[in-house]
């Protein structure tokens, strides 16, 4: 872990985190990079196995994180201020959502376990089961809906 991170920073209110601490809060699951279907009439939201074309399916990280908006302008910019608008679609296990809701991080989170592989070992990441949006037309995404995320 980077030396510019305060001990137990993840227990602080999100608004008190430094930019480096904010970024370090991500558990690396990759679930936020899954495309979602949102039904306007019901507001229902369904995750699909169809991932952003920039997601590395093995590492579950963005291939071009720093400049991702040049390639995917609609990619969400999560900040402490924007989180309120986005938290409803974030996975229940997401560290940002958990902390926003005042809950602790999961035991498999690397900040708790000390190992960035535990998110994958615990089966909490998208490693190995996504398909790139470059390979699936949007009209077929409903064929890739995930029943239980």
Swiss-Prot record:
Signal peptide: none annotated. It comes from the Bacteria. Pfam families: CxxCxxCC. Belongs to the UPF0260 family. This is UPF0260 protein RCAP_rcc02083. It comes from Rhodobacter capsulatus (strain ATCC BAA-309 / NBRC 16581 / SB1003).
